[in-house]
């Protein structure tokens, strides 16, 4: 009999990997750029799993890249000469794939207007074993409306699912939500509310700033701040028990260096392993 993890096991892990890794795209701090993650940057993490006698077994690789790209045609005037493109790519590895005979791969591409920092479009590819889904979110921030569409490339006759949702204020996908947190004053004891769209629904996610401390990281011993996003619970994005914590450097770069997700299945530790400098010409 083959062991296969349920989908509700994979989704929280994928969210954790994305949330942590995208945060860290804030490494480069050159003052000549509008944001510390410009003009381009790549970040590499490793995810590990622990339960009982299993201690920090490799389960996933993930890479995240922030780049500039030329503006595409969108509703309303462009306020910048370029768009920001955030890309997150996550795949299973090693023990996890062999134990469960199961492969997952997720890729998200998010396009933002950099001056107003509003999301324009999100594309997603989600592979879990033989299951494959492609989805897209089109954001109309000015009119408070988004359209989510999902299709099964292996079964095109079924057609695409579509959900239209209205919202007030600023709404983000999971990538841009983390970038938004980096721009906020992270004062211990405060709670920051972030509105996130996931699978056609809109969630209000409270993010608590828990504490500051020193931590050993790939960057050395640095001061970090701990954030606890409220993703779990009956009204949360994940409707089962769990606790997610993310540690970011407390300086202006806000580099996420570690994260931990505790679930009924075990504990997942995510660790920054490498920051890759990438060169990219300025847009014309």
Each predicted region: which residue ranges?
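Bacterial N-terminal signal peptides
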Residues: 12-23
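N-terminal secretory signal peptides that target proteins for export/translocation
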Residues: 1-8
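Active-site/ligand-binding surface loops and adjacent short beta/alpha elements
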Residues: 140-198
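Intrinsically disordered, low-complexity, compositionally biased regions/tails
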Residues: 8-14, 246
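N-terminal non-cleavable signal-anchor helices
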Residues: 23-25, 172
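Acidic, serine/threonine-rich low-complexity disordered tracts
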Residues: 27-139, 183-284
């Amino acid at each position: 009999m083959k062991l296969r993890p349920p989908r509700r096991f994979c989704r929280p892990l994928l969210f954790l990997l994305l949330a942590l890794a995208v945060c860290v795209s804030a490494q480069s701090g050159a003052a000549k750029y509008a944001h510390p993650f410009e003009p381009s940057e790549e970040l590499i993490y490793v995810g590990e799993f622990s339960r009982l006698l299993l201690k920090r077994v490799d389960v996933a690789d993930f890479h995240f890249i922030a780049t500039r790209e030329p503006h595409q045609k969108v509703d309303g005037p462009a306020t910048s000469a370029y768009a920001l493109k955030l890309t997150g790519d996550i795949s299973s590895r090693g023990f996890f794939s062999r134990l469960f005979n199961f492969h997952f791969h997720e890729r998200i591409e998010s396009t933002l207007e950099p001056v107003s920092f509003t999301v324009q479009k999100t594309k997603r590819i989600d592979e879990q074993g033989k299951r494959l889904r492609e989805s897209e979110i089109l954001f109309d921030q000015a009119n408070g409306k988004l359209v989510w569409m999902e299709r099964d490339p292996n079964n095109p006759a079924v057609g695409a699912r579509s959900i239209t949702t209205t919202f007030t204020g600023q709404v983000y996908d999971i990538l841009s939500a983390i970038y938004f947190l980096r721009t906020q004053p992270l004062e211990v004891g405060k709670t920051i509310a972030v509105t996130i769209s996931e699978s056609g629904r809109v969630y209000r996610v409270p993010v608590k700033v828990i504490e500051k401390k020193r931590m050993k990281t790939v960057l050395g011993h640095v001061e970090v701040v701990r954030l606890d996003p409220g993703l779990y619970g009956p009204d949360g994005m994940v409707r089962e028990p769990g606790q997610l914590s993310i540690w970011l450097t407390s300086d202006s770069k806000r580099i996420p260096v570690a994260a931990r997700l505790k679930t009924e299945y075990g504990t997942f530790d995510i660790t920054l392993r490498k920051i890759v400098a990438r060169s990219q010409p300025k847009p014309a």
